Amino acid sequence: MLALLAALQLQAAGTAQLPALLEDSLPVVTLADALRRATGLDPNYVAAIGQVDNAAWARRSAFTVFLVPAVSVETDATKNLPAFFNFGTLKPETYSVQAQVTLRYDLFTGGQKVAELSRSAAALDGAHAGELQARFAAALLTEQNYYAVLAGEELVRVARERVQRAAQQLAVGRARVVSGAAVQTDSLQLRLELSQAREELLRQEFALRVSRLTLGSRVGAGGPVEAAPLDSVLPTGLPLTLDAAVEEAALRGPDYRRARATERAAAASYRWRLGSYLPHATLTGTGIAFDNRFYPTSRKFTQLTLAVSFPVWDNFQRENALSQARVNRDVARATRETLERSVRRDVTAAYDGFTTARTVADISAGDVAVARENFRVQQSRYRAGATTILDLLEAQLRLVDAEAALVQARYATRLTLAGLEAILGRRLFPEQEVR
C-alpha cells in the first residue's frame, strides 16, 4: 500500500511541476505596468486623445476669429501669345505677373462667432471627459484580464490539490479493499473522482493559458505574460459614503460630464444655425500689384470693401439644417437627463457590488476553513472505517467548491472596485495602482 501511495504521489507531483517549469519562463508584468501599456495601445483611448487635440485647435480657431483677420496671399504669372496689355507697365507684354494680399474680417455674423466659441468650449470639455472615460474603460478591461490570470493560477492550484488528494485517497481506498475493510465500489468511486479531478485540472490549465495570452495581447506582448501577484489583503471599505459617491459621479463622472458637454455643444450648434437668418457684414482689404516679372512693383492698388449680405431664400436649406440641429439638441438633452436619472442606480450597483463582494470574500474564507477541517475529519474517519466513501467524497468536493468560491470572491471584489472607479473617474486607492 505504501509503495502504491508513493507512486501516485510522485505521478501527481510530476504532473504539477511540468506546467510550473513552463510558467517560470514567461515575462512578468505588474498591474501598474499593464495599465500603462494597455492604455497607450487601446484604440478608443488613442482616438479620445486625438479628439482632445482636435477640440483644442477648434477652440483656438474660435478665439482667433475675434482678434485676427483671415489672410490669404495669391500670385500668378501669365505668358501671352501674342503680347497682351499689361496693367503694370501699361503696354503690351509677353509676360504679366500679378500678386495679391487679402485680409478678411467678419464684423457681424448673426451671433455665429459667439455660438462657435461656446460650442468649442463645450466640445473641449467633452473631449477631456471622453479621454478620462476611455482611460478608465481601458483600465477596467486590463484589470479584468489581469485578475483573470491571477484567479486562473489559483484555480489551477486548487485543481492540482484536488488531483493530489484524489490520488492519495485512491491509494488508501485500494488498500482498504485489498484488506477487506471496504468494498470494491469504494475504489471505483475514488477512481472516478481522480478522473474528474484531472479533467477539471485540464480545463483550468486551458483557461489559464487563454487568460495569459489575452493579457499579453492587451499589453502589447507577442505571447503570453504572467501577472505579478497582488497584495492578498483586500480593502476593508470604501473611503466615501454612498451619497458622496453619487454626488461626485454626477458632478465629475466622465460619462455625465460628457453628456452635459454634448448637450451644450448641440445647443450652441443650434444657435449657430439661427445666425444664418440674420445679415452678415464683412470687411475686406486687398492689395494688388502688377508687373512683367516677380515680385511685381510697377503698379499697386489697394481696395477696402465693406460687404453686407442678407440671405433671403435658399430652397429650405437653412430650415433643414436648423431642424437637424434642433433634433440633435433635443437628443443630447434627453441623453443627459437619462444619465442623470440613472446615476444613483449605477453608483449604488457598483458601490453595493463592492461591499457585497467584500463580505462574500470574508464569508468564503471562513467556509474554506470549515470545509478543510470537515475534510480532515472525514478523511480520518474513513481511514478508521467510521464513515462511507460518499461522505468523504462529499467533503472533498465541498472543500474544492469553497476554495474556488474564495478565489472568485476575492477577485470579484477587486473588479467591482475598478467598475466604481470607472464611474467616478478617479482611483479610490491610488497607492494600490503603483505596485
Feature map (PLM): residue ranges:
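Long amphipathic alpha-helical coiled-coil segments
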Residues: 214-222, 272, 419-429
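A short glycine-centered flexible hinge/capping loop motif at secondary-structure junctions
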Residues: 177-181, 382-386, 423
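Sec/SRP-type N-terminal targeting helices
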Residues: 46-50, 54, 63-64, 93, ...
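Bacterial N-terminal signal peptides
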Residues: 1-9
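Metallo-beta-lactamase
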Residues: 204, 254, 409
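Small/polar, glycine/serine/threonine/aspartate-rich low-complexity segments that form flexible
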Residues: 16-27, 72-105, 116, 229-239, ...
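Bacterial Sec-pathway N-terminal export signals of envelope proteins
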Residues: 8-70, 74, 223-262, 311-312, ...
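Periplasmic alpha-helical coiled-coil/stalk elements that build and connect Gram-negative outer-membrane
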Residues: 29, 134-248, 350-353, 357, ...
